Amino acid sequence: MSSDPMELWHELAKERNAKGLDAILADEAVFHSPVVHTPQRGKAITQKYLAAAFQVFFNESFRYVRELKGDRDAVLEFEAVLDGVNVNGVDMIKWDETGKITEFMVMLRPLKAVNLIHQKMAAMLAAGGS
């Protein structure tokens, strides 16, 4: 397995490997949801949101279409189709000097997609996330 945080992220996303999230998230990780007002702080809650997202987003249509990468951060643009709705969004990811993800922010468009994701993520999180 690679030591590059983005290579690791792409491997986990491709495999929908929620168990692998534990190894790449920092203990103080913060998740910024497009549908939750406050940041979700801590590794456990960040892992829960990302595991649910693996189930909701990562279907056969999901693909990253662009990646902008700095030394300790990246922006990944993605596209997917969920229930006939075109979803376009970005994952904004930061990591520390050890390569662990410290911040993960998701932004989505259009509004119809935001509403659909809100509904699906709420259902997945209520069901336990995986």
Where are these regions (language model features)?
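A solvent-exposed, acidic/Ser-Thr-rich amphipathic alpha-helical stretch
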Residues: 18-20, 26-71
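Short acidic-aromatic low-complexity motifs
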Residues: 2-27
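Alpha-helix N-cap/loop-to-helix boundary motif
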Residues: 1, 13, 38-42
